[in-house]
A protein has these predicted regions:
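Hydrophobic beta-strand signal
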Residues: 74-75, 88
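Short acidic low-complexity segments
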Residues: 75-82
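Structural motif
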Residues: 70-72, 85
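Short, positionally conserved secondary-structure boundary motifs
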Residues: 1-68, 96, 103-107, 129-130, ...
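Short, solvent-exposed secondary-structure boundary/capping segments
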Residues: 108-113
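Short, compositionally biased
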Residues: 83-98, 102-107
């Protein structure tokens, strides 16, 4: 006789536990990055994602890194990154941009992940125009 007992239900956790992380809008010049006037809202981020703030990706310059327009990008605040990492940077203390960073002795290249766009290259003294605000650690994408 065949055993027809139901199998036990697997222990599934459908939604990971989360914590609230500030979403930054435009970053004001000269203010601490997490100052109240820079915070647009808060995102619920899974606890396993370690980040200090989020940004919303605007545009299609990072699509080959699978980061699309409207995605939430999780950023760990740090002033330096390794060459080849994706980071949020401020150029001329203006709006933040997300690019792959290539560091050289005499220049910095901010590289998009889309062949339709050209890298932004800063040589010599112009390298001081670029301020790394943090490393992209994760992104949260919506189903399209």
């Amino acid at each position: 006789e065949e055993d027809t007992k139901p199998l036990p239900a697997p222990n599934l956790q459908l939604m990971p536990s989360t914590h609230k992380v500030p979403r930054l809008g435009r970053i004001a010049c000269g203010t601490p990055i997490l100052a109240d006037q820079n915070i647009e809202s808060y995102d619920a981020i899974p606890d396993y994602v370690k980040c200090d703030f989020t940004l919303i990706c605007k545009g299609d310059s990072m699509i080959n890194a699978r980061i699309f327009d409207g995605d939430i990008v999780c950023i760990r605040q740090q002033p330096e990154v390794e060459s080849g990492e994706i980071a949020a940077v401020l150029i001329d203390e203006e709006e933040a941009t997300l690019k792959r960073i290539r560091l050289f002795e005499d220049h910095i290249s901010l590289e998009p992940e889309n062949p339709m766009y050209r890298p932004l290259v800063f040589w010599g003294e112009d390298m001081n125009r670029v301020h790394i605000i943090g490393k992209a650690t994760h992104f949260i994408s919506t189903i399209r």
